[in-house]
Every structure is written in C-alpha cells, then in structure tokens.
Amino acid sequence: MEFADSDKLAVGENVMAIGNPLGYDDTATTGIVSALNRPVTVTDDNNNEIVTNAVQIDAAINPGNSGGPLFNAAGQVIGINSSIASTATSSDSAGSIGIGFAIPSNLVKRVADEIIKDGKVKHVALGVVIKSDTVEADGVTRGGATITKSSATGSAVVSGGPADKAGLKEGDTIVAFNGNAVNNNYSLLGYVRAAALGDKVTLTIVRDGKTMDVD
C-alpha cells in the first residue's frame, strides 16, 4: 500500500475506512474528511495523557476498526483509524455517531520507520509549561497556549531546552506551529508529538501584544 502525504489533506476529501467492526471482517465504510489537526486525547497504560492531532472523519467506524487503514480516493493510505467520539457512558455501548478519528499517515509512517530501525520511538519536547489561554494582538483575539510557571518547579521554561534556546519566556502565548493555528494547549501538544527529533519548526507567538515568529 502507498502512503499519501497527510499534510496535503483537505477538508471535504472522500475517504474509505477498512476494518473488522464488531467482528464483521473486511468491512468498508465511506465518508469525507470532516476536520484536520483535531486534538484527541487518550490515556496510556501508565495513565499518561497522550495527545494526537488527528484526521476527523464522518465515515462510520466502530470497535474493531482501530488499526485499520483509511484511504483517499486514489487508494492511498492517509491514516490509521484509531478512535471515535461517543455519547455512550461506557466503551461497551459506544458506536459510531459520525465522528471518528485517524492518526495521520505521515505520523504513522515516521513512527513505523523508527520502530523498524531502532526498536523504539523518540519523542520531542519544547521544554515549557503551558496552559490554554486567549490573547489579543493586532486587534484580533485568538486562542493559544501560554507559557506559565509550574506549581511544582516554579519555572516556566526548561533551562537549555529547545524553547529556552529559541528565546521563549514566561508569558509568551504560542498561537501557531509551522503556520498551523494553535487554539489551546492540547493543539500544541499534538503538533509537538508529531514532530521528529531534529526537526526545525517555526512558532508564532504573541509577546506584549505583538506577534512574532521564533525558530
């Protein structure tokens, strides 16, 4: 199977999900890309929250679809189906309500390549403490992730870390990551998690009411 560049996905594109929902083998469902870079939070075995900026789709996926491919109209893999939003009170009664999520193919391919090569995945960190916030700059109010002091350590920026080296400081609000809007702290965490070790990125920040880019 060929992997497409998930960075080139557009809202409204046709998609097809393949999987074994509820034990029904080789089931195909269709829909469209409903949204991009949708922060989705899951909890791992150690009760740590993991945030991924997912592809949101309206194709019906249910328990048993997770791990199955999501294709575009050209038959290329654009993601791996992972989870759904649900109004159910337990996972046993959860089912599709037209809001499903897939891990973008670019992230899938990078993680798979790292596991094949090194047997593990290396994740990056900015080295900052953040909180969801709103900020005004150039007459526009927007959401973002503001760097704030940790109640545990009393520091906002890790000394010598990537953010420190880029000149970020307490009170800066990050509003974009490589040109993609950062609406809250979960959005930023998703972009950071998708980045590879050694990647160079541009952050758009608001400092003292002014917008600027830092690398």
Regions found by a protein language model. Name each.
Residues I18-I32, N37-G67, F71-A112, N185:
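Active-site loop architecture of trypsin-fold serine endopeptidases
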